Amino acid sequence: MKIVDFVGPELIVPQLSAHEKSAVIRELADHLAAHVKGPQKIDREVLAKVLLERERLASTAIGEGVAIPHGKLDAVGKLVACVGRAPQGVDFDSMDGRPTHLFFVLVAPENSTGVHLKALARISRLFKDPDFRTRLMQAGDAADMYKVISDEDAKY
């Protein structure tokens, strides 16, 4: 599974303006809803609610400065994602107690459990690489961040 199949440079936010958990999720939901065209119009409020409800079950911050908020919403039509970066770090209730800097929002239609889980596993493996995380943090803009992702994808 290639990450570039469901995230493009237009779906990368290199400088999140939000400074707290729910605001980060809302900012990324807004960005995703504005840039993804599904079979139906993606309602940013509904998308944010789906992501926040999943977050209430357990934090999606996996440690090492990374969070993977995810959920299911039929309006997307297919697997979609949005990447965000918060250089200042955000308290995201991470397992390691450290601030979260990199966010990978993943949204899939309701009936796509297999694809959703494969994507989560692929993203988790990718973000376990400290060099990859460092390169994403040091990338200048959305295009540079996308290049880091696509270069890593080429190895897969």
Task: Place the predicted regions along the sequence by residue.
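Cytosolic covalent-transfer regions centered on His/Cys nucleophiles
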Residues: M1-Y156
